[in-house]
Amino acid sequence: MTIEILRLGHRGERDKRISTHVALTSRALGAKKIIFTEEDKHVKESVERIVDSWGGDFKFEVVKSWRTYTKRFKDNGIVVHLTMYGENINKIMTEIREDISKTNKNLLLIIGAEKVPREAYDLADYNLSVGNQPHSEVAALAIFLDRLTEGKTLYSEYNDAKIKVTPSKSEKCVFVEKD
C-alpha cells in the first residue's frame, strides 16, 4: 500500500509553516507523496531539503483539480477524509485497515486547510474524525497514520539519508554524512 496526502486549500503566507509540518509529518509517518492544490515554492523547497538530508523517496506535487485527482485515484484506491465531523477513529480504524489489506489498494488521505467542499465528503470512502474537539490537522494526520501503520513507521530509516538519529536514553546520537 502506498499512502498519499491531499492538502486542500493551502493559503500562502498564512499556511506555509503548518503546510510544511503537514508534509514533514506525512513523510515521517510513511506517506510517499503530498499533493497540494496551490503552488508554494517555500513549502516545496523545505520538503525537498528534508528529503535530501534525511533520505527517502517522498514526492511533492501540485494539481490543478483536486476533484479530478481524487476521482482518478478512487478508481483503484481508497479515499479517507480526515474531518472532526466524521466517524469515530476508535470505531472505524480496524475496518479501514482490513479494507486496505484485503483489496491491496493504495490510500489517499484528504486533509483541509480551510472549509472543505461538500464534494470531498461525498468522494471519500471514509470520513473519519480524530476526536470531536478543534485541533490541528497535523495532529489528526499523525494520529491516523500512526494507527494505520500500528507504529511501524515511527523509526523508519532510509539508506540514502545523510543524517540519522539513533534513539538514546541519555544523549544525542546523530550521524551526519560528510560531503
From Swiss-Prot:
Location in or out of the cell: Cytoplasm
CDD domains for this protein: aTrm56-like
Highest taxon in the source lineage: Archaea
Keyword Cell inner membrane: no
Keyword match Isomerase: no
GO cellular component, one term: cytoplasm
Binding site for S-adenosyl-L-methionine: 82, 112-116, 130-137
The enzyme's E.C. designation: 2.1.1.206
Classification via Pfam families: Trm56 (PF01994)
Entry function: Specifically catalyzes the AdoMet-dependent 2'-O-ribose methylation of cytidine at position 56 in tRNAs.
Membership in a protein family: Belongs to the aTrm56 family.
The protein, known as: tRNA (cytidine(56)-2'-O)-methyltransferase
Source organism per UniProt: Methanococcus maripaludis (strain C6 / ATCC BAA-1332)
